[in-house]
Curated annotation (Swiss-Prot):
Keywords: Acetylation, ATP-binding, Cytoplasm, Cytoskeleton, Hydrolase, Nucleotide-binding. Its main location: cytoplasm. It catalyses: ATP + H2O = ADP + phosphate + H(+). Residues 1-2 form a propeptide. This is Actin-1. It is found in: Cytoplasm, Cytoskeleton. The modification N-acetylaspartate is found at D3.
Length: 376
């Protein structure tokens, strides 16, 4: 560990995308879908030296003949064999490093079950022979990336949304709230409302097209009802999108109706509070003395917070719920898609962090439960 040449690896395993790279870099080297695909029929591709599984972009490009599975659901690993394949792919194919030579910083969802983080630790030391590892909470890393140690993070990715209040670098578990509504649900909802317009999207391959439409054309309205009125009375909000086969489709109020479900989950038939209320409820679960710091440092992170207009809408909604004299500031850094990874890169390269790693020796002495004592 004393060697200067040994760079730590930072791997942020999201439900939708895996971000990986080297500590000290300002962006991840590899970003690929967290999917493992297996051939639907054995021996379809004659003479192609068919593999029994494909990971990431390769699985994505061959999706026509594969069954795709996401090993991470709602931010939590549910299939460890596939997860191992993703890590193997990360180290050997994407980063091209020997995992036994580098410490690894992994990320986990807030409120991750204890058994999950033990299993992660076990796989790193026993399967990949890591010299050292650490597990950090995703939202805390996003806050570090914004240069803060106190604030509340609204982290919304592909599989899950969390609001995590953090004080002096420590997450406050009693006030963390989780919302099972994220990017994947928005894509599904957009597929549904485009079908109502007469465009049919059903297969997993077509779902990727809809995800692209969502990322390129959707935005959050500041005033939903007013925007609906504008969309009904003029075509100024309409945009066209060219499908891979050359057909051009027009999309109107769907552009803001889709992300509106983040604020009104009833659109998806869910009874939960929207992201603005969830953030507010999370702040209200904290000690009254730190609320002021949380309102003034509300940080957005994750790909699902990338919609244009989301920060202004959030500002408006929280201002209407908070005490009238409260200063409210929503921080939405442009690189928030990768904030978690960037925070990990910062953390793993701090000199003060070097004594925090769990070493192979400590693991051999204590077993997987060491992770609860050293990572909190």
């Amino acid at each position: 560990m004393c060697d200067e040449e040994v760079t730590a690896l930072v791997v942020d395993n999201g439900s939708g995308m895996c971000k990986a790279g080297f500590a000290g870099d300002d962006a991840p080297r590899a970003v690929f879908p967290s999917i493992v695909g297996r051939p639907r029929h054995q021996g379809v591709m004659v003479g192609m030296g068919q593999k029994d599984s494909y990971v990431g972009d390769e699985a994505q490009s061959k999706r026509g003949i594969l069954t795709l599975k996401y090993p991470i659901e709602h931010g939590i690993v549910t299939n460890w064999d596939d997860m191992e394949k993703i890590w193997h792919h990360t180290f050997y194919n994407e980063l091209r490093v020997a995992p036994e030579e580098h410490p690894v910083l992994l990320t986990e969802a807030p409120l991750n079950p204890k058994a999950n983080r033990e299993k992660m630790t076990q796989i790193m030391f026993e399967t990949f022979n890591s010299p050292a590892m650490y597990v950090a909470i995703q939202a805390v890393l996003s806050l570090y990336a914004s240069g803060r140690t106190t604030g509340i993070v609204l982290d919304s990715g592909d599989g899950v949304t969390h609001t995590v209040p953090i004080y002096e670098g420590y997450a406050l578990p009693h006030a963390i709230l989780r919302l099972d509504l994220a990017g994947r649900d928005l894509t599904d909802y957009l597929m549904k409302i485009l079908t109502e317009r007469g465009y049919s999207f059903t297969t997993t391959a077509e779902r990727e097209i809809v995800r692209d439409i969502k990322e390129k054309l959707c935005y959050v309205a500041l005033d939903f009802d007013q925007e609906m009125g504008t969309a009904a009375s003029s075509s100024s909000l309409e945009k066209s999108y060219e499908l891979p086969d050359g057909q051009v489709i027009t999309i109107g109020n769907e552009r803001f109706r889709c992300p509106e479900s983040m604020f009104q989950p009833a659109f998806l038939g869910m009874e939960s509070a929207g992201i603005h209320e969830t953030t507010f409820n999370s702040i209200m679960k904290c000690d009254v003395d730190i609320r002021k710091d949380l309102y003034a440092n509300t940080v957005m992170s994750g790909g699902t917070t990338m919609f244009p207009g989301i920060a202004d809408r959030m500002q408006k909604e929280i201002t209407s719920m908070a005490p009238s004299t409260m200063k409210i500031k929503i921080i939405a850094p442009p690189e928030r898609k990768y904030s978690v990874w960037i925070g990990g890169s910062i953390l793993a390269s701090l000199s003060t962090f070097q004594q925090m790693w769990i070493s192979k020796q400590e693991y051999d002495e204590s077993g997987p439960s060491i992770v609860h004592r050293k990572c909190f």
